[in-house]
């Protein structure tokens, strides 16, 4: 009950109690169980498939709250990854329900900095921050020349932290599987 109940403020200003639905509870429990019982990276990882509007963001909150409440799992670094500004704003508001500070990553450099620490913190980042890009021409120069070159292809982000106590929870992951992100 402690990890699967949150209080949220609505747009009208009312505070409401939100209780985890069965499918959210089941998914969150399975994630926690896999982290505890999995012997390999593969057996500790997985995919949770939710339909649109089924409460993916809240499921992520319930997982995080379960982890923070468990003495053997509370030291995990959490990385909540999304792919759109509006989704980041929604997830940011929902992530505050976990409790504690939520770091909103604004740049690739800041992402490297936060990932490289041993802190068991909560970080939110947009997926494109994992790409290393080097601009060939600034937008101003390209505009003056009348040349709009395609953005340069991203380079591999590389390993920043070798800890196995990092959890990535990716919202709308299917949209990252095309173009330079896939």
Range-by-range predicted roles:
Residues 1-77, 82, 86-101, 118-119, ...:
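ATP-dependent helicase/translocase motor core
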Residues 65-67, 108-112, 152-157, 182:
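A generic local structural motif
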Residues 87, 129-132, 175-176:
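Residues immediately C-terminal
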Residues 102-116:
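Functional beta-strand-loop-alpha-helix junction segments that form "active/interaction loops"
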Residues 119-131:
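Conserved two-lobed SF2 helicase motor
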Residues 134-137, 180:
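Short conserved micro-motifs at the rims of enzyme active sites and ligand-binding pockets
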Residues 142-150, 155-182:
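SF2 helicase catalytic motif II
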């Amino acid at each position: 009950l402690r990890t699967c109940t949150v209080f949220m403020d609505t747009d009208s200003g009312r505070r409401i109690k939100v209780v985890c639905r069965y499918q959210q509870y089941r998914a969150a429990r399975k994630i926690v169980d896999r982290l505890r019982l999995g012997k390999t990276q593969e057996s500790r990882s997985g995919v949770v498939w939710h339909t649109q509007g089924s409460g993916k963001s809240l499921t992520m909150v319930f997982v995080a709250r379960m982890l923070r409440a468990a003495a053997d799992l509370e030291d995990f670094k959490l990385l909540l990854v999304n792919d759109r500004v509006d989704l980041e704003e929604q997830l940011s508001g929902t992530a505050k329900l976990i409790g504690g500070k939520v770091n909103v990553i604004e740049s690739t450099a800041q992402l490297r900095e936060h990932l490289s620490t041993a802190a068991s913190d909560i970080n939110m980042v947009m997926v494109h921050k994992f790409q290393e890009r080097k601009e060939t021409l600034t937008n101003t120069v390209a505009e003056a020349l009348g040349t709009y070159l395609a953005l340069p292809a991203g380079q591999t982000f590389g390993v920043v932290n070798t800890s196995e106590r990092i959890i990535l929870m990716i919202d709308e992951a299917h949209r990252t599987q095309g173009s330079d992100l896939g």
